């Protein structure tokens, strides 16, 4: 039998209930740090960008990002990751007001082995779909490109990287060409009782931007905990990141506060 991660086995009636509960929290913490784990999750991630220029404004993005593993063959799963962003974008012209609505939807499909070795990996296509409800909230382009994830989980660490680069393939001729890299490295250190320390900054590069203005590179740290409310497993975390490298262009932010609550649904093999 596997629960959460392939090959993870629980022995019955060998530990007190309190210890079993703590072990379950630890196992869940490791699973949520693995983007291609056999775990359905529905994260609600709120990103508050502070110091948005010009005018030292505030931008808010709520990402609804369900992750669902689907069996493909005896040896492989397809991990579907969708991000639906709900944004408030401040008006960067007159410094007052802003626009609220849905942004462009991203969808990634990772082919990942059900029983990986020490190196856990996934590879597949990434799509950026022009679902924005206002032109200032999206690109107006259909974009596609490759995506890859790789990680290792030596106790008590989880260390990995997730990256994709999408290119616009068609869309409005009056909209800018899309050629952008998203790269997220993640390092987590697991503590007792489901607690963990984490750093998972999101680095981006807009290859169409002027020279010297392409990269946004944040650094920061956060903490989180896996816990249960009734029978529902949850993962909550808070992180803060400083954009040490950022373009000197309208819309660039100085800081980001990230608050996330994930609903977790561990998969169990049916007998």
Spans of model-derived segments:
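Transmembrane beta-barrel domains of Gram-negative outer membranes and organellar outer membranes
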Residues: 12-271
């Amino acid at each position: 039998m596997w629960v959460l991660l392939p090959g993870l086995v629980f022995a019955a009636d060998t530990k007190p209930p309190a210890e079993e509960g703590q072990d379950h929290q630890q196992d869940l913490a490791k699973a949520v740090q693995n983007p291609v784990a056999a775990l359905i999750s529905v994260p609600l991630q709120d990103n508050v960008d502070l110091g948005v220029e010009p005018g030292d404004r505030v931008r808010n993005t709520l990402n609804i990002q369900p992750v669902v593993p689907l069996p493909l063959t005896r040896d492989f799963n397809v991990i579907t990751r969708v991000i639906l962003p709900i944004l408030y974008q401040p008006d960067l012209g007159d410094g007052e007001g802003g626009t609220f609505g849905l942004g462009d939807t991203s969808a990634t499909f990772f082919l990942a082995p059900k029983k990986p070795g020490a190196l856990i990996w996934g590879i597949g296509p990434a799509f950026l779909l022009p679902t924005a409800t206002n032109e200032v909230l999206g690109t107006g382009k259909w974009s596609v490109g490759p995506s890859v994830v790789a990680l290792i989980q030596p106790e008590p660490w989880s260390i990995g990287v997730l990256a994709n680069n999408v290119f616009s393939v068609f869309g409005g001729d009056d909209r800018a060409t899309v050629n952008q890299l998203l790269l997220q490295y993640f390092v987590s250190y697991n503590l007792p009782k489901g607690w963990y320390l984490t750093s998972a900054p999101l680095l981006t590069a807009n290859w169409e931007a002027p020279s010297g203005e392409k990269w946004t590179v944040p650094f920061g740290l956060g903490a989180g905990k896996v816990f249960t409310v009734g029978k529902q497993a949850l993962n909550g975390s808070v992180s803060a990141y400083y954009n040490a490298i950022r373009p000197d262009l309208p819309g660039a932010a100085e800081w980001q506060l990230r608050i996330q609550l994930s609903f977790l649904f561990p998969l169990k093999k049916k007998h």
